[in-house]
UniProtKB/Swiss-Prot annotation:
InterPro entries attached to this UniProt entry: NA-bd_OB-fold (IPR012340), Ribosomal_uS17 (IPR000266), Ribosomal_uS17_bact/chlr (IPR019984), Ribosomal_uS17_CS (IPR019979)
Keyword Ribosomal protein: yes
Gene name of the encoded protein: rpsQ
Family membership: Belongs to the universal ribosomal protein uS17 family.
A Gene Ontology cellular-component term: cytosolic small ribosomal subunit
Gene Ontology molecular function, alphabetical: rRNA binding; structural constituent of ribosome
Protein name: Small ribosomal subunit protein uS17
Length: 94
């Protein structure tokens, strides 16, 4: 079974989560912090509000900058806080 592909193994394990968010920090080497916003409804008052999650992601080529809109996907833990990696830069900051 040495000829099995890694894509086939990854598909068998299930889909990986992906998020789209804005880069809020790029001061580290090969790492960025991405702020992902989502809308949540209050359980009692039914009003919608925004919640922000800050994800640390691996940026191998240091290509993402502050304010860029990026797509990240989950991966194996790379450090204590970093378990996502940069997939693509959707839109560069102006």
């Amino acid at each position: 079974m040495a000829s099995s592909s890694t894509e086939g193994q990854a598909a068998a394990r299930g889909r990986k989560k992906s998020w789209t968010g804005k880069v809020v920090s790029d001061s580290m080497d090969k790492a960025i912090i991405v702020a992902v916003e989502r809308r949540v409804q209050h359980p009692v008052y039914k009003k919608y509000f925004k919640k922000t999650t800050r994800l640390m992601a691996h940026d191998e080529k240091n290509e993402a900058g502050m304010g860029d809109l990026v797509k990240v996907v989950e991966c194996r833990p790379l450090s204590k806080r970093k378990s996502c990696r940069l997939v693509e830069i959707v839109e560069k900051a102006k």
